[in-house]
């Protein structure tokens, strides 16, 4: 066992790549370490493609093991269960930049597994996993046009760009961006920002690509020293004769079909033509398979649509390259929801609903770094009917999780701070129609639904999806792409933001050669489109409603002395339980004495506040209270006049005349009016019944000395 180790400096940290010691039966395996973070990345490739398979079966699995942080998993079974949202999102993050680098026609199954085996809880292991995947593919010998590099980029006005910031640095950073690419090209960007201008965002992409060159060089050197022989794989030769025949027979008809603006009608026509092509060419005599005909038919579609776009001809739905589809906005569409919006852009539609909950509705996430509370949830649902199909209904898929997180990133920067608006927020985007850019429709709909619910957003947010078609004779950047343009194009570029700047940016590029100029043009067009969409949204709802929805819970925050917390909670929680049950409210108390009270309506809220106020209230000298006699003694009576507070009415303070026997005047359980005369240094309270009665009657009693309590 002779492991080969490659070390290199990456920013202010040393990265170690090791192969040949662990997982030696995998096609490629690399243990990557950055500081105390270690991720084992393995790649296995099937030697042959499955018969009849017409797609590339790449699967990426990122998994975080509890032992990496010195923890034992919770739950009954005490072992890791289904992938968390973080693991799913990181799996997608690794998948996206490597998928376009496998050669065209390579259909062998490839499985990537990245296992976090150690973490210092100070930095996200995702960058280490991406670097390790690149290195494992590089040494595996599997056909792969890499290696790739990956970098996380932060930004502050004081420091500028920050390479691979820690969790602590990200707390003050205005940007959290992950960039991945090859030596010559950026392939993937995933980011969230606090309304940063386009030039800062583009600069971050270029900075990340420049810095990751150290990673790419190290992976290439590791492959040179420890790599396996590259597979002797050749793509199946294209049947040029069949391709020419299909083009001659169906080229014009396909071109006409792509001038049908209605998606369903266009798909029906293309389906008919595809079936005709299969019937004509996939015969027993020819020996040509139906899959081969369908594949070349798809290639013909691809070439026809792209050539028209580059030639600046009208797009599939008749638009030019910069026009946004017609937009329709409705808010308040669901009467009992706290906030709702129906956002329609062309044939893409999202019904988005916002719900306000109390502090106890937060999502508690168990992760390697410890327990995290998430007070803003955004869930994206993509039912099969949205594209006119029957499909599987079940657990949330990776795509839905990824689109939901992108929409969440777009909106998160404009949410109010928890201190001023301590609601838990849940937004659900139901995609009811889809023809491209449903995640960006979710951003627009989420902004509108939150404003409709009365959530005080800093500014409205809109999102737009851009596309690119690049050929040898030129390129075209497309605004507001359709589903077909996404599928047939070279880039998917999604930007969300306000009038002031970008809040989220996601980019996936399928080809090399995307220049700084192209990205700059795409960002400029996206800005113009975003401002147009915001203008359409503002015609219906330009700012948050002045108050939260009548259907939403009411809340108020009060501050009490921390010593009073135990009084509100009571013995075994009896007091707080009594308040919440009797007033139908929810109470959340922080250790610093911050009390958040939630109730379904103002009446219940006020009742709960009154109960709390009475418990924490201090006796005020000179104030008159109504109390209950709780105990009679020879020298007077003890009266409970505030929750948890009793005071002494001395025998001389019961009546104007001389009182010989207290029981002749008072009984236990009797309700009386008392006036607070004094509170001594030991907190003992002196009360008077006769002064309370005299003050209410408007006469001043004769002055008498008040005896001390014995």
From Swiss-Prot:
Identify the main location: cytoplasm
Report the GO terms under cellular component: cytosol
State the UniProt keywords alphabetically: Cytoplasm, Magnesium, Metal-binding, Nucleotidyltransferase, RNA-binding, Transferase
Task: Please list the reactions this protein catalyses.
Answer: RNA(n+1) + phosphate = RNA(n) + a ribonucleoside 5'-diphosphate
Q: Which cofactor does it need?
A: Mg(2+)
Q: Where does Mg(2+) bind?
A: 486, 492
For this protein, the Enzyme Commission number is 2.7.7.8
Domain named KH: residues = 553-612
Q: What does this protein do?
A: Involved in mRNA degradation. Catalyzes the phosphorolysis of single-stranded polyribonucleotides processively in the 3'- to 5'-direction.
Q: Which family does it belong to?
A: Belongs to the polyribonucleotide nucleotidyltransferase family.
Indicate the quaternary assembly.
Component of the RNA degradosome, which is a multiprotein complex involved in RNA processing and mRNA degradation.
Q: What is this protein called?
A: Polyribonucleotide nucleotidyltransferase
Q: What are the top taxonomic ranks of the organism?
A: Bacteria, Pseudomonadati, Pseudomonadota, Gammaproteobacteria, Cellvibrionales
Q: Which gene encodes it?
A: pnp
């Amino acid at each position: 066992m002779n492991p080969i180790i490659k070390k290199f400096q990456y920013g202010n940290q040393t990265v170690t790549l090791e192969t040949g010691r662990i997982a030696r039966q995998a096609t490629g395996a690399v243990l990557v370490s950055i500081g105390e973070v270690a991720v084992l990345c393995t790649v296995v490739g099937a030697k042959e493609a499955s018969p009849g398979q017409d797609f590339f079966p790449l699967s990426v699995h990122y998994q975080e093991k509890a032992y990496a942080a010195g923890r034992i998993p919770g739950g009954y079974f005490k072992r890791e269960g289904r992938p968390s949202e973080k693991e799913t999102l990181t799996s997608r993050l690794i998948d996206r930049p490597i998928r376009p680098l496998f050669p065209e026609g390579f259909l062998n199954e490839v499985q990537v597994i990245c296992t976090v085996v150690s973490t210092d809880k100070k930095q996200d292991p995702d960058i280490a996993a991406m670097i390790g995947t690149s290195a494992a593919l590089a040494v595996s010998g599997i056909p792969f046009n890499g290696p790739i590099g990956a970098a996380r980029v932060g930004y502050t006005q004081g420091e500028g760009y920050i390479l691979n910031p820690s969790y602590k640095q990200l707390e003050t950073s205005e940007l959290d961006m992950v960039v991945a690419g090859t030596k010559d090209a950026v392939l993937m960007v995933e980011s969230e920002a606090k309304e940063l201008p386009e030039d800062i965002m583009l600069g971050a992409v270029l900075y990340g690509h420049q810095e990751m060159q150290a990673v790419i060089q190290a992976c290439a050197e590791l492959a040179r020293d420890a790599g396996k022989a590259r597979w002797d794989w050749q793509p199946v030769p294209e049947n040029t004769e069949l391709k020419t025949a299909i083009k001659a027979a169906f080229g014009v008809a396909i071109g006409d079909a792509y001038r049908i603006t209605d998606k369903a009608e266009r798909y029906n026509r293309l389906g008919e033509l595809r079936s005709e092509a299969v019937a004509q060419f996939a015969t027993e005599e020819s020996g040509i398979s139906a899959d081969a005909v369908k594949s070349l038919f798809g290639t013909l579609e691809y070439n026809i649509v792209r050539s028209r776009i580059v030639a600046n001809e009208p797009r599939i739905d008749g638009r030019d390259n910069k026009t946004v589809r017609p937009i329709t906005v409705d808010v308040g569409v669901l009467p009992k929801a706290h906030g709702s919006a129906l956002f329609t852009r062309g044939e893409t539609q999202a019904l988005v609903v916002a719900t306000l909950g109390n502090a106890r509705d937060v999502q508690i996430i168990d992760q390697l770094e410890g327990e995290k509370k998430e007070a803003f949830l955004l869930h994206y649902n993509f039912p099969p009917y949205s594209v006119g199909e029957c499909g599987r209904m079940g657990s949330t898929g990776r795509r839905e999780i990824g689109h939901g997180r992108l929409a969440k990133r777009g909106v998160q920067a404009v949410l109010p701070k928890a201190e001023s608006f301590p609601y838990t927020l849940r937004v659900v985007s139901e995609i009811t129609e889809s023809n491209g850019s449903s995640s960006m429709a979710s951003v627009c709909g989420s902004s509108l639904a939150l404003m409709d619910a009365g959530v005080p957003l800093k500014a409205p947010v809109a999102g737009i999806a851009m596309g690119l078609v690049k050929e040898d004779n030129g390129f075209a950047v497309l605004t507001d792409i359709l589903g077909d343009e996404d599928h047939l194009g070279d880039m998917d570029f999604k930007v969300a933001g306000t009038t002031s700047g970008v809040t989220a940016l996601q980019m996936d590029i399928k080809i090399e050669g995307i220049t700084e100029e192209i990205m700059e043009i795409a960002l400029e067009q996206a800005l113009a489109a975003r401002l147009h969409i915001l203008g359409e949204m503002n015609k219906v709802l330009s700012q948050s409603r002045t108050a939260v929805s009548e259907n939403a819970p009411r809340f108020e925050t009060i501050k009490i002395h921390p010593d009073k917390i135990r009084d509100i909670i009571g013995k075994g929680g009896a007091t707080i339980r009594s308040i919440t049950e009797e007033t139908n409210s929810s109470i959340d108390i922080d250790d610093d004495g911050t009390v958040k009270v939630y109730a379904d309506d103002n009446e219940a809220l006020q009742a709960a506040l009154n109960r709390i106020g009475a418990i924490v209230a201090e006796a005020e000298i000179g104030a008159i209270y109504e109390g209950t006699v709780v105990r009679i003694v020879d020298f007077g009576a003890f009266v409970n006049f505030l929750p948890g507070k009793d005071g002494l009415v001395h025998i001389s303070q019961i009546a104007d005349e001389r009182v010989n026997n207290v029981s002749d005047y008072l009984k236990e359980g009797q309700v009386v009016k008392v006036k607070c005369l004094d509170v001594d240094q030991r907190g003992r309270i002196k009360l008077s019944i006769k002064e309370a009665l005299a003050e209410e009657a408007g006469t001043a009693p004769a002055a008498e000395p008040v005896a001390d309590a014995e």
